[in-house]
């Protein structure tokens, strides 16, 4: 895929800011079982350990950032929007010390280069303008042996398209990057960024109101093992490890 021009990237970023700085109640941080399972699934898949320095790309209001910090990761947030980062600070209040950075991941602050054990994100990669360029930039933020890991929607799950049609806070313009979230696209992009041990897996089954119900997590764990369901499970994890120079 050809890299976007700086002007095209800037316009893309402006569209994303307009999209995300709208009032989105679903993005407010909570401690629901649904969100906690996302955090635990990504942390396990990426091999994160408490105390490791972790950068969350596209952290927004801290929906996942706060849960990561509460689990003992030295997490920092990076986002295009100072508005969303200010909301993150208000949710964290005095409970957590969370360094945040207003930047495009393609042009990160120089102080962040080679600084992180992991660069991660939740439902952020499909909003990024240029996958190849952005993943190469993320790899520069890692220590040797560091990992990139993302949780993304599965474009083969038809319920996402129903959501986009029915929920006013979701739009095709804002979320159409989901179509690129296929292993055949993401894994080669990770490898081109200098990463090895590239892998993916799918998980999940229920929407939040069922996943948060009593026994929802146990039922999901059973349904995930049913082979015909596996290609359409709603969530995907992707990872890669920075190869030694």
Residue ranges and their predicted role:
Residues 169-185:
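Acceptor-substrate binding/catalytic loop of class I
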Residues 107-119:
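A short acidic, Gly/Pro-enriched loop at the edge of an enzyme's catalytic core
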Residues 1-48, 51-60, 149-171:
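Conserved class I S-adenosyl-L-methionine
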Residues 110, 163-168, 198-245:
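A C-terminal cap/extension of S-adenosyl-L-methionine-dependent methyltransferases
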């Amino acid at each position: 895929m050809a890299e976007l021009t700086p002007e095209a990237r800037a316009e893309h970023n402006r569209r994303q800011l307009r999209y995300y700085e709208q009032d989105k109640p679903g993005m407010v941080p909570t401690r629901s079982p649904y969100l906690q399972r996302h955090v635990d699934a990504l942390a396990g898949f990426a091999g994160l350990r408490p105390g490791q320095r972790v950068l969350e790309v596209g952290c927004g209001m801290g929906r996942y950032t706060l849960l990561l910090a509460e689990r003992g990761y030295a997490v920092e947030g990076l986002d295009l929007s100072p508005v969303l980062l200010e909301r993150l600070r208000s949710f964290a209040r005095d409970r957590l010390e969370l360094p945040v950075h207003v930047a495009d991941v393609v042009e990160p602050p120089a102080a962040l280069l080679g600084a992180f054990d992991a660069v991660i994100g939740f439902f952020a990669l499909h909003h990024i303008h240029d996958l190849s360029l952005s993943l190469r930039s993320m790899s520069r933020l890692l220590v040797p042996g560091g990992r990139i890991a993302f949780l993304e929607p599965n474009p083969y799950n038809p319920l996402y398209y129903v959501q986009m049609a029915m929920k006013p806070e979701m739009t095709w313009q804002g979320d159409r990057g989901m179509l690129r979230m296929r292993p055949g696209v993401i894994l080669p992009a990770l490898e081109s960024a200098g990463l090895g041990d590239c892998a993916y897996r799918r998980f999940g089954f229920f929407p939040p109101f069922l996943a948060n119900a009593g026994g929802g997590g146990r039922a999901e764990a059973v349904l995930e093992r049913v082979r015909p369901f596996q290609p359409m499970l709603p969530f995907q994890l992707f990872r890669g490890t920075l190869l030694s120079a």
